[in-house]
Amino acid sequence: MAKLHFYYSAMNAGKSTTLLQSSYNYNERGMDTLVFLPVVDDREGERKIATRIGLSGKTIALTKDTNLFKCISDKLAENPNIRCVLVDEAQFLTKSQVEALALVTDELNLPVLAYGIRTDFQGEPFEGSVYLLAWADLLIEIKTICHCGRKATMNLRIDDEGNPIREGEQIRLGGNDRYTATCRKHFRLGQPTQTK
């Protein structure tokens, strides 16, 4: 029986790298995958995942209006060799899209591997993450570390000088130049780096 997996972590833990490796593993065995990326993440263009270590892969762009179950059903009808669905930046999914992913596992018997962060720079949950945490069959934490050596669980937004930003829009695209993964203590203290 297929399952809905949610791989979650703070930023910069290697979620996209893990996703691309999973897709590669299927492809190496002669099985096709569908890889989706919400359009809101256009740092590398709408249809490409790019990792910090230089790996990249093509994706299918998702908008908030994409009927995910229909899209996957149609692709499966065209190519019955599709064996897995993968979603990067899954925190940007809508509730109905997470429902659709659950339906894909239940009705189409395809495993779904979703990768994302749980919370934003204010410690508030993303819509997609809320429902993945509630409905996924398996929750898998991908660990990364804070500058102090503790497990990083939070995402601290920083300005050009490295100062913490506590207010603003929930979504502001950026990587290492705009966000740093911290433990809860250093998130609360607003310390993106080790103080002397």
UniProtKB/Swiss-Prot annotation:
Pfam families: TK. Its EC number is 2.7.1.21. Coiled coil: none annotated. The keyword Secreted does not apply. It catalyses: thymidine + ATP = dTMP + ADP + H(+). GO terms for biological process: DNA biosynthetic process; thymidine metabolic process. Homotetramer. Belongs to the thymidine kinase family. This is Thymidine kinase. The lineage of its organism: Bacteria, Pseudomonadati, Pseudomonadota, Gammaproteobacteria, Legionellales.
